[in-house]
């Protein structure tokens, strides 16, 4: 029987020079690795695009300054220099940011290089927010036109921006007549707000966990919430004044009550809607009742809890302003009532400006805490 000859496999073709991963003698070290990983691209040296929109705040400030200086006023008020100086500052800062807008892309700040990081973030914010800043300046210009230049609204009730900004400067330390200034009122409101907010938040989270986890607590707690929760906290001012002889304690109780209901409802909803699979796995691994509550139910309910905290914070702002008008001797709400009683509406608008910045800052801080705690959550509202 003839022997069967097995065909020998053909030899692989010779690798071309430079095609394999091994570096040739003429190839510098690291060149082969760079070819093997083409996704690693060299740093681009192309200059950042120059945005003409960065000049928008400067153009708007120049237009507002021209209107304020050259359009004749229909109202007789004492001229001030605060408003023109603010416009000049915005104009100069806008020009500087617009001319140096390419620097923030070239900067490579590190955590240890705080000045470079701060300058880069400031330039980036100034360029990206230029249209919004320009719109704000144009609103000031329209306000100046409607109040002082065209007199479309009565002056005592709607002062111009120059009067309001002058009041902010003059009343920051003292409001006159021996009354506290805006800074002292802001600190007093902050203490009052945080006291009531923390008490209401802690009670709301505790009640929400108890009612949501234990059926017996749910049986008795839900009817109480249905009766007390929908009642506005400001409607209970007479009752709070009878219960607490101290007006400050009365205001703290009202703020805590306004925060308690939304925090309790959202915490209750979050605890009751925890996935059963989470609890089953924890029980299988030997988890006890305390572990299920504090390590499974509450962490899973954190998104709902933060929604309740945001709703409670908005309710606390309203309740604080109303409660400060009843017996409290300092605070932004008290300052507005005091200025309105003297028909000094420049002080009223100045306090409103402080309230906008004050409440927005507190809300921003709460959003930062939410983003830090719920870092795993995607698609949430950014502030």
Model segments located where?
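Transmembrane alpha-helices
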Residues: 1, 36-122, 130, 253, 257, 290-323, 350, ...
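C-terminal transmembrane helix and the adjacent membrane-cytosol boundary/short C-terminal tail
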Residues: 96-108, 272, 307, 349-383
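Transmembrane-helix boundary motif in ABC transporter permease subunits
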Residues: 195-225
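Short cytoplasmic-facing helical segments at TM-TM junctions of multi-pass membrane proteins
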Residues: 220, 262-309, 332, 336
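Glycine-rich helix-loop "coupling/hinge" segments at transmembrane-helix boundaries
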Residues: 242, 270-271, 318-358, 374-383
């Amino acid at each position: 029987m003839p022997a069967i000859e097995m065909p020998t496999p053909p030899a692989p073709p010779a690798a071309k020079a430079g095609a394999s991963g091994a570096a040739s003698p003429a190839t510098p070290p690291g060149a082969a690795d760079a070819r093997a990983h083409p996704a690693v691209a060299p740093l681009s040296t192309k200059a950042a695009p120059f945005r003409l929109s960065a000049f928008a705040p400067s153009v708007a400030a120049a237009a507002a300054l021209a209107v304020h200086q050259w359009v004749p006023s229909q109202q007789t008020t004492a001229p001030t220099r605060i408003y023109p100086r603010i416009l000049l500052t915005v104009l100069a800062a806008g020009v500087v940011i617009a001319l140096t807008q390419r620097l923030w892309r070239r900067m490579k700040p590190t955590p240890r290089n705080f000045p470079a990081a701060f300058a880069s973030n400031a330039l980036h914010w100034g360029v990206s927010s230029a249209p919004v800043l320009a719109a704000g300046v144009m609103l000031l210009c329209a306000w100046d036109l409607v109040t002082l230049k065209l007199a479309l609204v009565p002056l005592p009730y709607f002062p111009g921006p120059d009067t309001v900004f002058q009041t902010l400067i003059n009343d920051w330390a003292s409001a006159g007549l021996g009354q506290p200034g805006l800074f002292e009122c802001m600190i007093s409101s902050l203490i009052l707000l945080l006291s009531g907010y923390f008490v209401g938040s802690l009670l709301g989270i505790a009640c929400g966990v108890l009612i949501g986890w234990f059926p017996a607590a749910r049986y008795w707690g839900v009817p109480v919430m249905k009766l007390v929760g929908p009642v506005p906290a400001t409607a209970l001012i007479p009752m709070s004044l009878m219960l607490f002889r101290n007006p400050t304690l009365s205001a703290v109780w009202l703020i805590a009550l306004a925060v308690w209901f939304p925090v309790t409802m959202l915490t209750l909803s979050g605890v009751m809607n925890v996935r059963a699979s989470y609890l089953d796995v924890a029980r299988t691994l030997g988890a006890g009742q305390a572990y299920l509550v504090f390590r499974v139910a509450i962490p899973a309910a954190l998104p709902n809890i933060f929604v309740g905290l945001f709703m409670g914070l908005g309710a606390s702002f309203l309740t604080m302003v109303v409660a400060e008008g009843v017996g409290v001797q300092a605070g932004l709400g008290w300052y507005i009532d005091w200025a309105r009683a003297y028909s000094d509406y420049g002080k009223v608008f100045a306090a409103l400006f402080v309230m906008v910045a004050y409440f927005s800052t507190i809300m921003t801080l709460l959003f930062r805490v939410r983003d830090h705690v719920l870092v795993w959550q995607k698609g949430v509202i950014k502030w």
